[in-house]
Amino acid sequence: MQTQNAPETAENQQTDSELGRHLLTARGFHWIYGTSGDPYALTLRAESDDPALLTRRIREAGTPLWQSTTGAWVTGRHGVAAEALADPRLALRHADLPGPQRHVFSDAWSNPQLCHIIPLDRAFLHASDADHTRWARSASAVLGSAGGAPAEGVREHAGRVHREAADRTGDSFDLMADYSRPVATEAAAELLGVPAAQRERFAATCLALGVALDAALCPQPLAVTRRLTEAVEDVRALVGDLVEARRTQPGDDLLSAVLHAGSSAASAGQDALAVGVLTAVVGVEVTAGLINNTLESLLTRPVQWARLGENPELAAGAVEEALRFAPPVRLESRIAAEDLTLGGQDLPAGAQVVVHVGAANRDPEAFLAPDHFDLDRPAGQGQLSLSGPHTALFGAFARLQAETAVRTLRERRPVLAPAGAVLRRMRSPVLGAVLRFPLTTSA
C-alpha cells in the first residue's frame, strides 16, 4: 500500500463557490423546515434551541415513527429505535447508489435529500454491514467485542496515560482540552502504533476529523468542511504508511492484529486501513465525548461524585448510565435497502430512518425515572448507545477509557468541581460535542 497524493474526491473537485453553495442550500432547508416547528429539523439546525425540549418532542410525537418535513422518518421511542438499529435492511448507504453517498441539489425543491450532506466514504463511514462485521471480528483481539474487554496491554496503557494526564492538571483546567481529548488521542495513537515523531500530526488530524459524524447530517462551515476532507486524506496516508510497515514488522498493535486476521494480503491491508481510519474518525471523538459526558453527569451531582470515593467499583455503572443518560452519539441515520414496514409505517426503499438515541434512552416505557441519573440503575435495561456499526467497533474501548478517567480523577482529584458552564459546539446535532468544560480542583 503506497502513499499517494490525495485523489480528486467530490469535495476536492468542487470550487469553494460550488461547495459553499451546496452547504448553504442544505443549511437553508434545515432553517426553512424548522420554521414549521419540526423538532427534527430544529435539531439539525443545532443552534440555540433547547435540545432537551426537542428530544422530548421527538419522542412524544403522535406516532412511534413519524415523517419529518425534511423527509426523514424519525423515532425517539425505545421499542422502534431498537428494532430499527437491529434491522439489517436499514443500511448506512443507498443500495442504488454504488459510488460516493452524495446528493446534488439540482432541483432541490422537488425532493431534497438531506441524508448525506457530504460523502464520507473515504472515511469508511458509509460501509456495508458485512464490512463492519468483518472489521469488528478482526479487531476484537485488541479492541474487545460486545460484552468483552480490550486487550490487557490496552488497559495498562490507559491507566498510565490517565494518571499522567491527571497529574498534569493544575488547580483549574479544561476537561476537554486538557484531559479528555489528549487521553483519547494518545490512546488511539498507541492502538495504531503511531511513532512518536508523528503523534503531533496525528493529534492535529484527529481534531479536524472531530466534526465528521456531525457533518454527515448537518452542513458545517466551508472552511471546516475543507479541513475535514483534507484530514480524511491525511489520516488515510498516515495509516496507509503504518499498515505497509506492519506487513514486514508486525507488533502487538491494532493494525497488526487486523492484518494477521485477514484471509488475503490485499483484503487484510484494506481492512487494516479502514479500522485505522475509523479509529481516528470515530474512536477518538466518541471516547472523548463519553469521558466528558460521564464526568459532567457526576460532577454536576456532588452526591454521586462523593459516592464514587466510597465505592470506586461504581465507576463502570457510572459510565453505563452516562451512555443512557447523555449518549456520545445522539442520532443514528439509516437508509432502507428495500421496501419495509417499521413502527406501523410502510417505508419505500431509499427512505431515510433516523433514530434519536438520546430520546429513546429516556423513554419512560423502557426506563424507570428516565430523567434521573442513577448510579444504581440495574444493568441490561437496553440502553441503545454505541450500537451503530462503526460506533460499536469502539464500544469496549470507549467504556474502558471513560471508566479509567472516572477512577483516576476521583482518586487524584477528589474535590474536582465545575468552574463554569459546559460550552458545546454549534452545528453538532449528532455528537453534542463539548468545546469547553472548566473545572477546579480547589474546594
From Swiss-Prot:
KW Metal-binding (keyword) present: no
Biological processes per GO annotation: antibiotic biosynthetic process
GO MF annotations, alphabetized: monooxygenase activity; oxidoreductase activity, acting on paired donors, with incorporation or reduction of molecular oxygen
Pfam families (alphabetical): p450
Cytoplasm among keywords: no
Keywords, comma-separated and alphabetical: Antibiotic biosynthesis
Matches recorded under InterPro entries: Cyt_P450, Cyt_P450_B, Cyt_P450_sf, P450-rel_GT_act
NCBIfam families named among the record's database cross-references: P450_rel_GT_act
Entry's family note: Belongs to the cytochrome P450 family.
Reported function: Involved in the biosynthesis of the anthracycline antitumor agent aclacinomycin A. AknT is required for the glycosylation of aklavinone aglycone by AknS to yield aclacinomycin T (rhodosaminyl-aklavinone).
Name the record gives this protein: Protein AknT
Species of the source: Streptomyces galilaeus
Gene that specifies this protein: AknT
